[in-house]
Amino acid sequence: MIPIQLTVFFMIIYVLESLTIIVQSSLIVAVLGREWLQVRRLMPVDMILISLGISRFCLQWASMLNNFCSYFNLNYVLCNLTITWEFFNILTFWLNSLLTVFYCIKASSFTHHIFLWLRWRILRLFPWILLGSLMITCVTIIPSAIGNYIQIQLLTMEHLPRNSTVTDKLEKFHQYQFQAHTVALVIPFILFLASTILLMASLTKQIQHHSTGHCNPSMKAHFTALRSLAVLFIVFTSYFLTILITIIGTLFDKRCWLWVWEAFVYAFILMHSTSLMLSSPTLKRILKGKC
């Protein structure tokens, strides 16, 4: 059991992190949305960032409400909020993976004809790919929705005589729900890993090819991109692992360590959100023009 003062401290840290992420997400959507209305078109990277901003905005509010309901044992409200959090969490993972795929397709120097064909097709169909990620999320959330319904049924049966066979089946399906959610996160994470490794290999190859003993502007740009990619890789991998541990939920007494753990998790999410803000040329150009 941790002291109440420490619990309050980490609760405040978590709330401040969450509000910062919400403000960042709102800023991304507002700035890029305004640009979209003015020029009537956006680059694919900005389409992803707007989608990510909306998804992360909803995810963060769902997370805050979910955690406070969990802490104060509001179980019926918690069940309804959990499915919302899971939906936007899976969608956020897919959108992050698509962003990395876009950078890999756009910036890598591979010249194989299959890769060039994929680049042409993906860039041409990017709005439909975004819609596809939303549809995949809707499909993968179905087991969680069923598990959420089962959880509510288990809560209503808590004070009633139970049929042990039925209860065991319900609890087994509830465990399957967590496995399905884990798989739904692992697939886009593998896509992220593959795209990141390919892009890092391509950038390293370009640096070695253009190395002439002195640092020209092209070399500096490649070094900067490689460094940014390495930071994004570390932050997103840490984010994935912390979310995975949160889903498994077997490490800590959830009520006792809730705010310590959430403050730790959302520190990574805040770093990732900040790095995404800095990845959009359009966003950086507009914000610099306002200063």
From Swiss-Prot:
Q: Which residues are glycosylated?
A: N80, N163
Q: Which UniProt keywords apply?
A: Cell membrane, G-protein coupled receptor, Glycoprotein, Membrane, Receptor, Sensory transduction, Taste, Transducer, Transmembrane, Transmembrane helix
Q: Which CDD domains match?
A: 7tm_TAS2R16 (cd15017)
* UniProt similarity note: Belongs to the G-protein coupled receptor T2R family.
Q: Where in the cell is it found?
A: Cell membrane
Native source species: Pan paniscus
How the protein assembles, per its UniProt entry? Interacts with RTP3 and RTP4.
**Gene Ontology terms: cellular component:** endoplasmic reticulum; external side of plasma membrane; trans-Golgi network
Q: What does this protein do?
A: Receptor that may play a role in the perception of bitterness and is gustducin-linked. May play a role in sensing the chemical composition of the gastrointestinal content. The activity of this receptor may stimulate alpha gustducin, mediate PLC-beta-2 activation and lead to the gating of TRPM5.
Name the UniProt record assigns to this protein: Taste receptor type 2 member 16
